[in-house]
Amino acid sequence: MASNGADRDPEIDRLLEAKARELTKKMKYSGVVELSKENFDDFLKTFRVAVVDFWATWCAPCFMLEPIIKRLALEMPDVGFGRLNTEEEPEIAAKYYVMSLPTVIIFKDGEPVDQVVGVVPKKILQDRIKAYLED
């Protein structure tokens, strides 16, 4: 028997709408997102765990890390992955005390919880990120 919607639970409708909004927002940030002051805070709020790669155009090791970040973004769809060019956004880099490049900061619930400086193997970075997904 088909439902005409009259007997639908309003609480279920509210939850479905909230989930749809959440998924739509996450789709906006799929893959590795180029971050700026315009979208940085919103990006962190969108994901329970977010990873930000701080880089610069003159930094050769940063370009070695980029494919690792891209692979992790494909393999870990529940985690937000972003890259922030420190030359274009020095204020954000300074806010998080980024002194060396590349620096990867892992955020949980919008707060920095871990930091990796330099190029590291994918497995090491992946394990560090997974540690914040478990609780």
How should these model regions be labeled?
Residues 83:
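Conserved residues in the N-terminal Rossmann fold of short-chain dehydrogenase/reductase
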